[in-house]
């Protein structure tokens, strides 16, 4: 692992342990050149399906892109980063278990909205407003009315 301080290519692992959820390994490393210590988080690289975009393009699933979108919807809301990470972890597990090679972005968006609905309704409406691309206030109000009925 390349040292973030001096860019030396080799380091040794000083300590290694699973994180709280068990999905990643936290490692403390020491640079063999400058001696400084740094932390890395490692996770198994999983093979996830391609995402079929609205325009028909296909691209690899990008966890960070999804996390960023959800974080934007949850901005200034009482939703922790850990809650968002667990939400995306559940989605990745669901995608792997489906065995599908491709998944429409619409399916991902609907799943995220269902999860956000139970976590924070304001974040749900924010995510829905971007995901569903409301054309006018009427569509937005319709979504709010549906939310109030539930």
From Swiss-Prot:
GO terms for molecular function: ATP binding; DNA binding; zinc ion binding. It holds the Pfam family ATP-cone. The keyword Transmembrane does not apply. A zinc finger (unnamed) spans 3-34. PROSITE patterns: ATP_CONE (PS51161). The keyword ATP-binding applies. Its cofactor is Zn(2+). Residues 49-139 form the ATP-cone domain. Keywords: ATP-binding, DNA-binding, Metal-binding, Nucleotide-binding, Repressor, Transcription, Transcription regulation, Zinc, Zinc-finger. Binds 1 zinc ion. InterPro entries: ATP-cone_dom (IPR005144), NrdR-like_N (IPR055173), RNR_NrdR-like (IPR003796). It comes from the Bacteria. One of its GO terms (biological process) is negative regulation of DNA-templated transcription. Belongs to the NrdR family. Negatively regulates transcription of bacterial ribonucleotide reductase nrd genes and operons by binding to NrdR-boxes. This is Transcriptional repressor NrdR. It comes from Geotalea uraniireducens (strain Rf4). The lineage of its organism: Bacteria, Pseudomonadati, Thermodesulfobacteriota, Desulfuromonadia, Geobacterales.
């Amino acid at each position: 692992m390349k040292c973030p301080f001096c860019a030396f290519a080799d380091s040794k692992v000083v300590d290694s342990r699973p994180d709280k959820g068990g999905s990643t390994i936290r490692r403390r490393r020491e640079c063999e050149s400058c001696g400084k210590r740094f932390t890395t988080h490692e996770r198994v690289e999983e093979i996830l399906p391609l995402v079929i975009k609205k325009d028909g393009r296909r691209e690899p699933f990008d966890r960070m892109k999804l996390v960023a979108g959800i974080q934007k919807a949850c901005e200034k809301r009482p939703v922790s980063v850990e809650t968002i990470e667990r939400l995306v972890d559940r989605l990745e597990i669901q995608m792997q278990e489906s065995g599908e090679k491709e998944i429409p972005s619409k399916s991902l968006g609907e799943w995220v909205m269902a999860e956000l609905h139970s976590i924070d309704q304001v974040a749900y409406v924010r995510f829905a407003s971007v995901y569903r691309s409301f054309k006018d206030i009427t569509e937005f109000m319709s979504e709010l009315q549906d939310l109030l009925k539930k």
